[in-house]
From Swiss-Prot:
Signal sequence extent: none
Residues covered by region (Interaction with pAP): 256-275
Name under which the protein is recorded: Capsid scaffolding protein
This protein's record includes keyword rRNA-binding: no
GO biological process: nuclear capsid assembly; proteolysis; viral release from host cell
GO terms for MF: identical protein binding; serine-type endopeptidase activity
Enzyme class: hydrolase
């Protein structure tokens, strides 16, 4: 296994503050360093795995190029990696080491000597460079590759002057062919320490991606910066110039491999995949937020001496003074709300028991023949009086089922021609009785003179006579066939007391549920 080259910015000018700040004057005084700068793992002593070949002063900050050549490092990482980490990628040992180093130690950290008050920096300011997970300075991301040119190429904002000077000094460095040997036990401890010390680092890969953008790295091959386990195939990695470019040739797309959809439609599909939280969860979150705000607003209670009988008068304290005296937690309220929601669901399910009655579709309306009489007789109208013309019912139309509360009543006094009329009984509510006039095919009924001259009927009789009635058609001659009497359904809402409209039931259940919830919540 040959050497691995690493490069990157040690700092960016005017981007850090405090003791991490490096100005152009300090860097100019510290370069070139008095001796070779070792490269170790996470600033651990006696854990050198390489050395810095050259450091140049770029317009953006100090930039270094180093070499890592430790055979034991590749052996330890190769034994630690899982068998499925590389997937189906057929890689050499050198490429495996490049992938592991790029994603396990993607940053660099410059260690410098702390200056005394009034001390001027000199060539001994820089101590060493450590490979780590996340550096404290801005833009300290590194790139590993098999050659110096390929390691420097992804830094697109590096000036041409600094690039050429860096490669020239690295070619003359005596440490380019040096090999560093360490015990595998010490390397294992150093790598494990790095993992343990950074296991609580929040948004690790987001920080790595941000540092990569700050350093101007584009076209890298081995740094994945992904949150998923395993490595992406080479077709997903961006190619880098140099010897590594031949390894990252993406396959050509075959017809039908991609589907192009608008961005708005894609975003809508992604949003719809997320299941909405349940109503109980939302209510529980609201209750918890309200309790949290109340705890924050309430001032801390003053210390008081313990009392023999002390009730929970401080809502900011959730601890119980005596068994059974703890304030009710917010989970109880959430349980009550869940119970109320189950009651509402039960009430809404009642509408399934009363389906909406079905009526056959009516034929296009037609006008009555000229000789037909439309309307129904009324005791206060003269004989032969007619109502305004209306549309006649068509064959095949079905009327709503008869009301079970309607009963036959005897003939009304003074109206002998209305025998056998059906009228609602007195105990039926007014809103259940049909109020629309019933259209029938009938002949004009003549009212006798005695009935016309008779005094006005009693209020009860008048109310019964004013109610809508259904008059039977006069009997036709025996020779002519009698057409069936068809009822009109001009008012589909005309239903009996035994049939409940589904929409009405839903409204009634909804109102009842709302009243029930409001009463229960007011008591809580």
């Amino acid at each position: 296994m040959g050497p691995v080259y690493v490069s990157g910015y040690l700092a960016l000018y005017d981007r850090d503050g405090g003791e991490l700040a490096l100005t152009r004057e300090i860097v100019a005084a510290a370069l070139p360093p008095a001796g070779p700068l070792p490269i170790n793992i996470d600033h651990r002593p006696r854990c050198d795995i390489g050395a810095v070949l050259a450091v140049v002063d770029d317009d953006r900050g100090p930039f270094f190029l180093g070499v890592v050549n430790c055979p034991q490092l590749g052996a330890v990482l190769a034994r630690a990696v899982g068998p499925d980490f590389f997937g189906d990628m057929r890689l050499s040992d050198e490429e495996r080491l490049l992938y592991l180093l790029s994603n396990y130690l993607p940053s660099a950290s410059l260690s410098s000597r702390r200056l005394a008050p009034g001390e001027a920096p000199d060539e001994t300011l820089f101590a060493h460079v450590a490979l780590c997970v996340i550096g404290r300075r801005v833009g300290t991301i590194v790139v590993y590759d098999a050659s110096p040119e390929a390691a420097v190429a992804p830094f697109r904002q590096l000036s041409a002057r600094a690039r050429s000077e860096l490669l020239a000094r690295a070619a003359e460095s005596p440490d380019r062919e040096r090999v560093w040997h360490m015990s595998e036990e010490a390397l294992t401890r150093a790598l494990l320490s790095t993992a343990v010390n950074n296991m609580l680092l929040r948004d690790r890969w987001e920080l790595v991606a941000a540092r990569r953008r700050e350093a101007g790295v584009r076209g890298h091959t081995y740094l994945q910066a992904t949150m998923w386990a395993g490595l992406l195939p080479k077709s997903g990695a961006s190619p880098a110039p140099g010897p590594s470019a031949a390894m990252a040739a993406p396959p050509s797309a075959a017809p039908g491999d991609y589907i192009f959809v608008p961005a708005a439609q894609y975003n809508q599909l992604v949003v719809n995949q997320r299941p909405a939280p349940s109503l109980e969860s939302q209510l529980g979150a609201i209750v918890s937020a309200a309790m949290d705000r109340r705890h924050r607003r309430s001032p801390s209670p003053e210390p008081r001496p313990p009392a023999r009988k002390r009730r929970y008068d401080d809502y900011a304290q959730d601890n119980a003074y005596y068994p059974g005296e703890a304030p009710p937690p917010a989970s109880d309220l959430a349980a009550v709300v869940s119970s109320l929601q189950r009651e509402i669901s039960h009430l809404r399910a009642q509408q399934l028991r009363y389906p909406t009655p079905y009526y056959a579709p009516a034929a296009p309306p037609q006008l009555l023949p000229p000789g037909a009489v439309v309307g129904h007789p009324h005791p206060h109208h003269a004989a032969g009086a007619l109502y305004p013309p209306m549309y006649a019912p068509q064959p095949g139309l079905h009327a709503p089922p008869p009301s079970p509360v309607a009963h036959a009543v005897p003939a009304l006094p003074g109206l002998p021609g209305l025998q056998g009329l059906a009228a609602p009984v007195a105990h039926v509510p007014a809103q259940v009785v049909p109020q629309q006039p019933v259209v029938v095919q009938a002949q004009p009924v003549a009212v006798p003179a005695a009935a016309a001259a008779a005094p006005a009927p009693a209020p009860a009789a008048a109310a019964a006579a004013a109610a809508p009635v259904q008059a039977a058609a006069p009997a036709a001659p025996a020779s002519a066939p009698q057409p069936p009497v068809q009822a009109s359904v001009s008012a589909p809402a005309d239903v009996s007391a035994g049939t409940i409209d589904a929409s009405s039931a839903a409204v009634a259940c909804q109102r009842g549920a709302d009243i029930f919830v409001s009463q229960m919540m007011s008591q809580r």
